């Protein structure tokens, strides 16, 4: 356009969905520059935003427009000429407030510009009507003076000039009337479009309320799900503790099974040893029998010793002869007795060990 912007900010741009008139459709993928401009040629104010090479907002501000804040960072206005509703999402509430204040200022300036334009049109129309009314009176006055020849000779250049001016004024008056009619039609169209946009704005406000309710429901659902997740996490913690206990129990079971296997090996060894016990018992009985036989032999030998002593006492003669033999015999007997005692001690020890 060539003019410098009056005010510039950055925001995310949205447009109302033309089919539903409820949902917002993003017009920019990211925050873009949004500016107020004054169009000198048309004596109007515009809001313009460009995303790359694409013009996403070209809205002429009229005195009937209203900028509405729908949240802390979002505002919207209806453009009847574009037959749509624009929405702007700002990064802060302060930016939204500045944009809304500038909108009010520009709207007031647009109203003053419109009033001045209407005053000029009315002044031009009144001037045309006055000029049209003066022309017949001048012609009548000129026809009163002199004869017809004099009127023809003296008034001809003036009549021609007045007639030409009158025709121009009539054309201007006709064009002015046509423009007034055109503006009335355009005004009616704007009123109807404004009514439709007002309805769309009300529906949009209702939709915002519905979104707020849905957001509240979603937030409650989110809180409920968060509580459920915390419960599940707590249950998972209990499950992990149970798993750890199960792992410890499995480890203990494995240790007990190892001990059982060791005990089974010991029991198996004891069973093998128990199979040897009867053999040892039979050997013990055999040794006992031998011991009894040895004891009997010992008893017999003792009897013989007593008998021999008696014989010695009875016959000292035989004592000298048999002394050496008896001494050797006693030595042999003592050795056998010692062996017998050693054998008995070994047998007793064996019985104790078993």
Curated annotation (Swiss-Prot):
Kindly give the PROSITE patterns that the UniProt entry links to this protein: WH1 (PS50229)
Gene3D superfamilies associated with the record: 1.20.5.1700, Pleckstrin-homology domain (PH domain)/Phosphotyrosine-binding domain (PTB)
Family affiliation: Belongs to the Homer family.
Question: GO CC: one term?
Answer: dendrite
The alphabetized UniProt keywords are: Cell membrane, Cell projection, Coiled coil, Cytoplasm, Hearing, Membrane, Synapse
Please report the name of this protein according to its UniProt entry.
Homer protein homolog 2
Concerning Pfam families, the annotation shows: WH1
Annotated coiled-coil segments of the chain: 92-120, 160-329
Does the record carry Coiled coil as a key word?
yes
Name all WH1 domain ranges. 1-110
| Biased segments, Polar residues type | 123-146
